[in-house]
């Protein structure tokens, strides 16, 4: 049996994706930060085996997707998703959900992607998992498109630079000169892994402060703990990164050394900027396209309106987009010429 259904509305409202198989869709579940209680995997398995085709897809946005859902089974699947909504959205992320058996409420604000952060990774400066969960209620449920990626250090393993909103954990360093033995380990690490802003002078490490990106490689390399991260969790914000057929580009630096409170205020204003640029209609466009449409100065004024910046914060005066060869393809010639 097959039924007629507006799959576009089902996608926008309940996270169902159209399948090339007639009469079928794929449901995906939100996992902010990509970490979930292990027992919820059995819930996903049961959905896949009971109503799907027995398979689970690990999506590029750290979600679990179950293909092969028949249209007539959508209500049953929505009800079966209750543990995900209750344990992740409500209990872990503090999202207000009135009916946990009605399925997901929107797809606009995409699942927040994150690396494992400093709960696991020694290179990470910040707690990406915690931030992902605290930001979830600001991006979901919303009909307006926003792709967010959070990483714990400038290594950017999860590709925050390719997201509408890329959030990168950075750290201010504390240097205790009396502990420095002049071994040069930090200088070598910074030169090899980072930006080369350290040098040895009179047997002690010195830093060119303006060049430091706050990655923390010096902290990992120092055998005497002369370099240590300051306890404040700070972030860098990049905007406008995207893949896509229409002018793919790497995101540009917008804010540096900002606090979590600043990021929360910025996200609220990002959605207001989207609404203004789209005339109140949640049309699918990347943030970079909207910045192009409105201009950076207009964007900056709207997004920073009412935001209380912390003393360390830095703001990009302008952003310059340099398109790559993906559009013109002027460097390509027929083979053999």
From Swiss-Prot:
Siroheme binds at residue 157. GO terms for cellular component: cytoplasm. Binds 3 [4Fe-4S] clusters per subunit. The keyword Electron transport applies. Pfam families: Fer4_10 (PF13237), NIR_SIR (PF01077), NIR_SIR_ferr (PF03460). The keyword Heme applies. Keywords: 4Fe-4S, Cytoplasm, Electron transport, Heme, Iron, Iron-sulfur, Metal-binding, NAD, Oxidoreductase, Repeat, Transport. [4Fe-4S] cluster 2 binds at residues 180, 183, 186, 222. GO terms for biological process: sulfate assimilation. Its cofactor is [4Fe-4S] cluster; siroheme. [4Fe-4S] cluster 3 binds at residues 190, 212, 215, 218. SUPFAM superfamilies: 4Fe-4S ferredoxins (SSF54862), Nitrite and sulphite reductase 4Fe-4S domain-like (SSF56014), Nitrite/Sulfite reductase N-terminal domain-like (SSF55124). [4Fe-4S] cluster 1 binds at residues 115, 121, 153, 157. GO terms for molecular function: 4 iron, 4 sulfur cluster binding; heme binding; metal ion binding; oxidoreductase activity. Pathway: Sulfur metabolism; sulfite reduction. It is found in: Cytoplasm. Belongs to the nitrite and sulfite reductase 4Fe-4S domain family. This is Anaerobic sulfite reductase subunit C. The gene is asrC.
